[in-house]
């Protein structure tokens, strides 16, 4: 079984020392789903939302969140991300928006937390912009889809 890397021998939380690791290409993608009623979704799609372009705002929020993950998650390293991509897909059959992120860099540590933070904040932004018209919007199934690079190898969600 793997050990927690952020816990020292005394059981205290510490940032992992990555100084001796070699730079490798690292990528990660994550997804989240935002479920709402059909009227709210149509308001977003049609561009009739009084706060403006919900998807553009969510996309920018996700990008900004990935860049600032190290400020939000206490033991994350500040990273020089080389790529952040946010895709939003409307699933009209289920009244959902699927958000997918892709983060990439050449560095000493992975970008999983950046990918997860990106979709989380993009989803929260959709909620924030739509809460005036619907308060019971559901954010769910936030998960890592893929990661590559580093000594732990690749991961692909089932």
Curated annotation (Swiss-Prot):
Binding site for substrate: 75-77, 113-114
Origin: domain of life: Bacteria
Keyword terms, alphabetized: Lyase, Molybdenum cofactor biosynthesis
A biological process from GO: Mo-molybdopterin cofactor biosynthetic process
Enzyme Commission identifier(s): 4.6.1.17
InterPro entries, A to Z: MoaC, MoaC_bact/euk, MoaC_sf, MoCo_biosynth_MoaA/MoaC, Mopterin_CF_biosynth-C_dom
Molecular functions (GO terms): cyclic pyranopterin monophosphate synthase activity; GTP 3',8'-cyclase activity
Pathways per UniProt: Cofactor biosynthesis; molybdopterin biosynthesis
Catalytic activity reported: (8S)-3',8-cyclo-7,8-dihydroguanosine 5'-triphosphate = cyclic pyranopterin phosphate + diphosphate
Gene3D superfamilies to which the protein is assigned, alphabetical: Molybdopterin cofactor biosynthesis C (MoaC) domain
Active site per UniProt: 128
PANTHER family documented for this protein: MOLYBDENUM COFACTOR BIOSYNTHESIS PROTEIN 1 (PTHR22960:SF0), MOLYBDOPTERIN COFACTOR SYNTHESIS PROTEIN A (PTHR22960)
Record text on subunit structure and interactions: Homohexamer; trimer of dimers.
Family listed: Belongs to the MoaC family.
HAMAP family: MoaC_B
Functional description taken from the UniProt entry: Catalyzes the conversion of (8S)-3',8-cyclo-7,8-dihydroguanosine 5'-triphosphate to cyclic pyranopterin monophosphate (cPMP).
Name assigned to this protein: Cyclic pyranopterin monophosphate synthase
Gene: moaC
């Amino acid at each position: 079984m793997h050990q927690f890397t952020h816990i020292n021998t005394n059981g205290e939380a510490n940032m992992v020392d990555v100084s001796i690791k070699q730079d490798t290409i690292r990528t990660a993608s994550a997804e989240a789903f935002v479920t709402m009623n059909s009227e709210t979704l149509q308001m977003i799609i049609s561009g009739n939302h009084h706060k403006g372009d919900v998807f553009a705002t969510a996309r920018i929020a996700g990008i900004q969140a990935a860049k600032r993950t190290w400020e939000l998650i206490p033991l994350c390293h500040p990273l020089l991300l080389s790529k952040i991509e946010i895709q939003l897909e409307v699933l009209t059959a289920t009244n959902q928006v699927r958000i997918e992120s892709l983060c990439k860099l050449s560095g000493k540590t992975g970008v999983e937390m950046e990918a997860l933070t990106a979709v989380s904040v993009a989803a929260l932004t959709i909620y924030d912009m739509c809460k005036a018209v619907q308060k019971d919007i559901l954010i769910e199934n936030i998960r890592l889809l893929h990661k590559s690079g580093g000594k732990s190898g690749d991961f692909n969600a089932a």
